[in-house]
Amino acid sequence: MDNLKKKYQHHLSLESASREYGPFQMLGRIQSDSDIKMLSFAGGEPNPSKFPIHKLSVSFPEVNSWEKDTNKDATVSYELSNNANEGSLDLLGALQYGQCQGIPELVKFIKDHVGQIHMPQYKDWDIKITNGNTIGLEYCLRLLVNRGDCILIEKYTYPAAITAMRPLGVKFIPIDMDENGMLPESFEKVMETWDSSLGARPHVLYTIPTGQNPTGSTLTLERRKKFLTLAKKYDIIIVEDEPYYFLQMEKYDANWKPDKQAFNISSFKKKLIPSLLHLDTDGRVLRVDSFSKLIVPGLRLGWITGNSLFIDRITRYAEVCTESPSGVSQVVLYAILNRWGQNGFLEWLQDLQNSYTMRRNALLLAADKHLPKSVCKYHSPKAGLFLWVELDKNRLICSNMDKSISEIEMEIFVELVNNGVKPVCGQLFMGEPNSADKIFFRFAYSLADLSTFEAGLERFTSTIQKYFQL
């Protein structure tokens, strides 16, 4: 920890640097060194004899049943007891005020998962279970940035991240992108030609490297390595936001069908592009993961992985802010993951990949059929849930040229909604929406009924012909 402090203490925000442990957590860490039985009057927790929840049962598919459509469910039950059996979950402890880091059994499962998939290349790393992805990002921001700081972001990025950053008083510095993610040369140009009138050079980069929201781009391995090299050169902390990491897909093929071979864990892992966390050798990546796209959003659970200094500071904040994540949610999640095991969880993730690959392919097939190539430009996403369509502004009808790109895009969006089709307009994904210089629309293929894909894109095309020379 001392080495980490020397290396990264200067990255802590004023708020984070001044954070202390929660007072009751501090008391809990003080243990007696005698053999006298402790009679504790310290805790103000409610008496568990008055907990109206006596038992929790969770039903979910058995490993393999989702592939064979057998609908075979497993049911796991936990009962309230002062004496949990060895190896089982302590439901009483889960329902009481909990450990801020998370239920120990779930923490261990996730740490084992991180070790198996990402294999961090330095020793002093840890995780913190979060109340979902959004608060995970909030933790990272409060850890690192002060009011007035500049933060590096992709030119188009997750709107909730932008909304979370604005009240913190940060300035957005966009990095240009293409279909393979952020451009290292754009990053380097920003850093080398930094305008000191904006304040100190940025020391934080926020990125969604895989299946990026909204562009669907996936940062190539070569670029991932390059960005880590640049991060060391310019002393940058990278916040790696990865809710779509496990939704990686095969190259687009309209005739693609899922592989019916037995699940092979080695093959599954080899197909995953190495994460920034894996490539990081000195602890400058904070990775934010979520169960929302992998299990269900309503559990509001995720986790952060990073060096132990950063995780310790995040935990101090959580102790007096969100406290522990929901005990009930953690019990439900642990019941599923413990039953499946590490390999079963990965097998489930492969099934998710297959499901979303089929949906992506269906939307691309409809796009190839209905979107006019003279105006619409898009690429096949390699991961995630989104198709990002650019409309060629050079083919706008002249009567629209007296308006800004943002105004034209919004006008088209309103017309699309009136005509019964609703993508999302590109400017909502920008730190400064009024600076839009291109027209984009994002189509999500995760939820819409497959039978509506063609009709939706037909409506899109019939609407934009009012604005463009097709």
Swiss-Prot record:
<dbReference type="GO" id="GO:0006571">
    <property type="term" value="P:tyrosine biosynthetic process"/>
</dbReference>
<dbReference type="InterPro" id="IPR015424">
    <property type="entry name" value="PyrdxlP-dep_Trfase"/>
</dbReference>
<dbReference type="InterPro" id="IPR050859">
    <property type="entry name" value="Class-I_PLP-dep_aminotransf"/>
</dbReference>
<dbReference type="GO" id="GO:0005829">
    <property type="term" value="C:cytosol"/>
</dbReference>
<dbReference type="Pfam" id="PF00155">
    <property type="entry name" value="Aminotran_1_2"/>
</dbReference>
<dbReference type="GO" id="GO:0008793">
    <property type="term" value="F:aromatic-amino-acid transaminase activity"/>
</dbReference>
<keyword id="KW-0663">Pyridoxal phosphate</keyword>
<keyword id="KW-0032">Aminotransferase</keyword>
<comment type="function">
    <text>Has aromatic amino acid transaminase activity.</text>
</comment>
<dbReference type="InterPro" id="IPR015421">
    <property type="entry name" value="PyrdxlP-dep_Trfase_major"/>
</dbReference>
<dbReference type="GO" id="GO:0009074">
    <property type="term" value="P:aromatic amino acid family catabolic process"/>
</dbReference>
<dbReference type="GO" id="GO:0019878">
    <property type="term" value="P:lysine biosynthetic process via aminoadipic acid"/>
</dbReference>
<dbReference type="GO" id="GO:0005634">
    <property type="term" value="C:nucleus"/>
</dbReference>
<keyword id="KW-0963">Cytoplasm</keyword>
<protein>
    <recommendedName>
        <fullName>Aromatic amino acid aminotransferase C569.07</fullName>
        <ecNumber>2.6.1.57</ecNumber>
    </recommendedName>
</protein>
<keyword id="KW-0808">Transferase</keyword>
<comment type="similarity">
    <text>Belongs to the class-I pyridoxal-phosphate-dependent aminotransferase family.</text>
</comment>
<dbReference type="GO" id="GO:0047536">
    <property type="term" value="F:2-aminoadipate transaminase activity"/>
</dbReference>
<dbReference type="GO" id="GO:0030170">
    <property type="term" value="F:pyridoxal phosphate binding"/>
</dbReference>
<dbReference type="InterPro" id="IPR004839">
    <property type="entry name" value="Aminotransferase_I/II_large"/>
</dbReference>
